[in-house]
């Protein structure tokens, strides 16, 4: 009898010990955070994160890096940021198979007027970059309504990222906003930006390096247009397999542009501009220039960066009377194998300074 009791006790104790062994806990289905600190500390504890009316403290990032695979992030209410001169970013998101979206009526407001001084990133106040989508892979950003970024909007360094129906409205910065690029893409693959609406004071799109990138159904107002580059002078100086299509560029300095860095090396290849409509362009309707140095054109092109297999198809519209319809300044032998079809840009001046234009193109 005593032996039986001992066996029962031993079995009971053993079961209790097994039950006490810690096991991996599954993330809760959903969490709602009302502060940046809580979001940072609790971001891996739930599969759906709702960010409700968060006021991000000055000099801090709304840190959503390292999310669990498959996490959904929902911006709800109004997301705002305290004022401080610093580099940023104000928001950073990373992870795999992440969905970033917003609730109905939500907005993300950078209140950039506190930093805007007409100098952008070239001096004056130090201004924070807005949204880092770095290592945000096999993921999506959908429907965000963003207002008043201090300088650049999205910095994209990711693979397989879809950005759909995002609005970036910096129209309040017409006087003092500067360098408010909407989408800067570098060292990325398979990026798809569809249905973007942009009001800003710099490039609507700037692809500095990467491959398999598409921008379609976009509306770009007030900035510097749709750009490849500037390419060159970085660790990654290759842009290839890019399609920019079915988009409008209005009230902007440039329409479509390829710019490469003076005396640098690299490659721009298989780039297509298709079905682009221009109006109210104040500087250049279509421009390719291989003379950029320290952020400005020199007028002297170099040929270290090859610009080949480029398609301009149905790029049409008007520029202002003191603007230039088309300007192509290539290095010797570096612009080759271009396809030029249905290009009709009118209203401005014809350039007399084009050089080394690819066969088939017209300047």
UniProtKB/Swiss-Prot annotation:
Question: What are the record's GO terms for cellular component?
Answer: extracellular region
Specify the protein name. Endopolygalacturonase B
| EC code | 3.2.1.15
The superkingdom of the source organism is Eukaryota
Q: Which UniProt keywords apply?
A: Cell wall biogenesis/degradation, Disulfide bond, Glycoprotein, Glycosidase, Hydrolase, Repeat, Secreted, Signal, Zymogen
| Origin species | Aspergillus oryzae (strain ATCC 42149 / RIB 40) (Yellow koji mold)
Recall the GO molecular function terms of this protein's record.
galacturan 1,4-alpha-galacturonidase activity; polygalacturonase activity
Kindly report the protein's main subcellular placement as a broad class. Answer: secreted
SMART domains from the xrefs? PbH1
**Gene Ontology process terms (BP):** cell wall organization; pectin catabolic process
Q: Carbohydrate attachment sites? A: 162, 356
Keyword Glycoprotein among UniProt keywords: yes
């Amino acid at each position: 009898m005593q032996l039986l009791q001992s066996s029962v006790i031993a079995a009971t104790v053993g079961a209790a010990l097994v039950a006490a062994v810690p096991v991996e806990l599954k993330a809760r289905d959903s969490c709602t955070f009302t502060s940046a600190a809580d979001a940072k500390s609790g971001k891996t504890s739930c599969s759906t994160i709702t960010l409700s009316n968060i006021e991000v403290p000055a000099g801090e990032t709304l840190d959503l890096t390292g999310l669990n695979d498959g996490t959904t992030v929902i911006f709800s209410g109004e997301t705002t940021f305290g004022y401080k001169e610093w580099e940023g970013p104000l928001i950073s998101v990373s992870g795999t198979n992440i969905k970033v979206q917003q609730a109905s009526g939500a907005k993300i407001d950078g209140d950039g007027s506190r930093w805007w001084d007409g100098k952008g990133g070239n001096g004056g106040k130090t201004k924070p970059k807005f949204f880092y989508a770095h290592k945000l892979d096999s993921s999506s950003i959908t429907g965000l309504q963003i207002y008043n970024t201090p300088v650049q909007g999205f910095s994209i360094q990711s693979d397989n990222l879809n950005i759909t129906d995002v609005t970036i409205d910096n129209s309040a910065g017409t006087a003092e906003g500067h360098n408010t690029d909407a989408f800067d893409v570098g060292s990325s693959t398979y990026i798809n930006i569809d249905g973007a609406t942009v009001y800003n004071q710099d490039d609507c799109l700037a692809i500095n390096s990467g491959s398999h990138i598409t921008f379609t159904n976009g509306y770009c107002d007030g900035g510097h247009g749709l750009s490849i580059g500037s390419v060159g002078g970085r660790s990654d100086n290759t842009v290839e397999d890019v399609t920019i299509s079915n988009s409008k560029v209005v009230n902007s300095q440039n329409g479509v542009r390829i710019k490469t860095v003076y005396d640098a090396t690299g490659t721009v290849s298989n780039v297509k501009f298709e079905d682009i409509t221009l109006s109210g362009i104040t500087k250049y309707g279509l421009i390719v220039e291989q003379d950029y140095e320290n952020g400005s054109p020199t007028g002297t092109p170099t040929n270290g960066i090859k610009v080949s297999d480029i398609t301009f198809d149905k790029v049409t519209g008007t520029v202002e009377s003191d603007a230039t319809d088309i300007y192509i300044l290539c290095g010797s032998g570096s612009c080759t194998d271009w396809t030029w079809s249905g290009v009709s840009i009118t209203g401005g001046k014809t350039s007399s300074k084009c050089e080394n234009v690819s066969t088939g193109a017209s300047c």
